[in-house]
Amino acid sequence: MEFFNILQSACNDVNLDFNDKKYNQLISYKNLIQEWNKKINLTAIVEDDEIIKKHFIDCIKIFKSSPIGEAKSLIDIGTGAGFPGIPIKILKEDIEITLLDSLQKRINFLNTVIGELQLKNIQCLHGRAEDYAQEIQHRQKYDIAVSRAVANLAVLSEFCIPFVEKGGYFIAMKGPSVEEEITAATKSIEILGGKIEDIIKIDIEDTDLKHNLVIIKKVKETGKRYPRKPGIIKKNPLK
């Protein structure tokens, strides 16, 4: 009951309904992470309490950003072990989710989670964001792109903004010190058709984690040349 109460409290804070079904799905997800993490490297966070607080509650906090609540479609880029895409799907069943990752082993894990939890309207893509963002069925097709991946904001923006339709949002889940990244990325975000709309500070209760949600609105279409070819984005971020 302790974990149920912790998760319910976090959901209450962002006006989300929470029930036994959602709780059981999250616990099953936690168990699968712990089981698969013995075979492949999914996360360094493996204890029950830490997975609940540092992964699940961190993902719940993304609902502090108003665009998530109204979104019909979302792509999670560089999803890794499924964060934040799978918790978002569990907590908001009516949203269509696409999980994108470059490692086949992680895709195998994610498909197992989707099957075990009987999640609907959720798909996995194996490959690079740079490639999928040029495909007509994915380019500028999503209400929301989100990423919790470790990369600077200028790089993440070029990976993610091309997936977002005009009027949609890219939400970057960043660490505590984001001001310099934002300053360095402002021009690249503008080039890609985005505009920083909000920065939401996030505290994770009973942990030392302090995060920021950078909310970027897509105000114009992304030019056809973006994203650039694989390898170029990280070597030469837009400035």
Swiss-Prot record:
Cytoplasm as UniProt keyword: yes
Subcellular location: Cytoplasm
SUPFAM superfamilies noted in UniProt: S-adenosyl-L-methionine-dependent methyltransferases
UniProt xrefs under InterPro entries: rRNA_ssu_MeTfrase_G, SAM-dependent_MTases_sf
GO molecular function: rRNA (guanine-N7-)-methyltransferase activity
EC number(s) from the headed UniProt entry: 2.1.1.-
GO cellular component, one term: cytosol
One Pfam family recorded for the sequence: GidB
Residues the entry annotates as binding S-adenosyl-L-methionine: 78, 83, 129-130, 148
This protein's record includes keyword Cytoplasm: yes
Keywords recorded for this protein, A-Z: Cytoplasm, Methyltransferase, rRNA processing, S-adenosyl-L-methionine, Transferase
Role: Specifically methylates the N7 position of a guanine in 16S rRNA.
Similarity comment: family membership: Belongs to the methyltransferase superfamily. RNA methyltransferase RsmG family.
Protein name as annotated: Ribosomal RNA small subunit methyltransferase G
Lineage: Bacteria, Bacillati, Bacillota, Clostridia, Eubacteriales
Gene (UniProt): rsmG
